[in-house]
Regions:
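Bacterial N-terminal signal peptides
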Residues: 2-11
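Aromatic- and glycine-rich peptidoglycan recognition patches
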Residues: 122-230
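...with weaker cross-activation on analogous glycine-rich loops/strands in unrelated enzymes
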Residues: 78-155
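Sec/Tat signal peptide C-region and signal peptidase I cleavage site
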Residues: 12-18
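Exposed boundary/loop context
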Residues: 6-7, 57, 81, 127
Length: 230
């Protein structure tokens, strides 16, 4: 009998140990944040000329790319009440402000806003407000930020450096800032660092509340029907 008990203990002990290892593995699995998943998506699109293959529900531009990267169930970067005078960038910025998510510091996965990247109102002046958006990919030791965005018909990587916003390259020839606004008849060309307007984190606070379930409504309807028959 003691032999059987020993074998049973070994078998069940091994099973329990294996089960505990599986449980530990499940517990150790990292949780992927919204910003991490969005950044992974955006990076996978670099080099693409259109978003139409992924979705026809967003505009094929910088705000559409950013929305699509973060899009999940009940999560859209756009507010529910986009105003007639707003573009996608200003609408997203307004929602970020309302949620208290605006920041002056770039972090991987954060939204980055730019102003005056093109002559939106076609008056030749530097007065066009928020006009461009992207997703921060990484922040270098020298302060150079790499971001993913859709510009010029292409999803691409570009750089800016807020410590040296007017410098195209450093002393070693490394690019600090890419060009983001072309030279116009009345304006010079501008580097990305000169046009940064701020950042915004994206987390669960951007997600819309779960809609109320209809079960209670159905019960009420059935109850009313029974009452009516009486």
């Amino acid at each position: 009998m003691w032999v059987g008990a020993l074998v049973s203990a070994l078998v069940w002990g091994g099973a329990a140990e294996a089960a505990s290892k599986v449980t530990a593995t499940k517990k150790a699995r990292p949780v992927v944040q919204l910003s991490e998943r969005a950044l992974w998506r955006a990076k996978s699109w670099v080099g693409m000329t259109t978003l139409a293959k992924m979705s026809s529900a967003v505009t094929d531009d910088c705000s559409g790319m950013t929305r699509l990267a973060f899009q999940q169930r009940r999560l859209d970067l756009l507010p529910d009440d986009v105003l007639p005078e707003e573009n996608g960038v200003t609408a997203i910025h307004r929602k970020a402000r309302a949620l208290g998510m605006l920041s002056d510091t770039p972090t991987p996965g954060a939204l980055v806003f730019f102003q005056n990247t093109f002559d939106r109102n076609r008056d030749g002046l530097f007065n066009d407000g928020l006009t461009h958006i992207g997703i921060v990919e990484r922040v270098g030791a020298d302060g150079t930020v790499t971001f993913v965005h859709k510009s010029g018909g292409l999803v691409k990587r570009s750089r800016f450096n807020l410590l040296q916003p007017e410098a195209r390259k450093d002393a070693k020839g490394h690019v600090l800032n890419d060009w983001l606004r072309r030279k116009g008849k009345k304006t010079r060309g501008y580097l990305a660092g000169e046009l940064v307007a701020g950042f915004a984190a994206v987390d669960e606070r951007w997600r819309s509340p779960e809609p109320p379930r209809l079960a209670s409504a159905k019960l009420t309807v059935k109850g009313d029907a029974r009452t009516a028959r009486r």
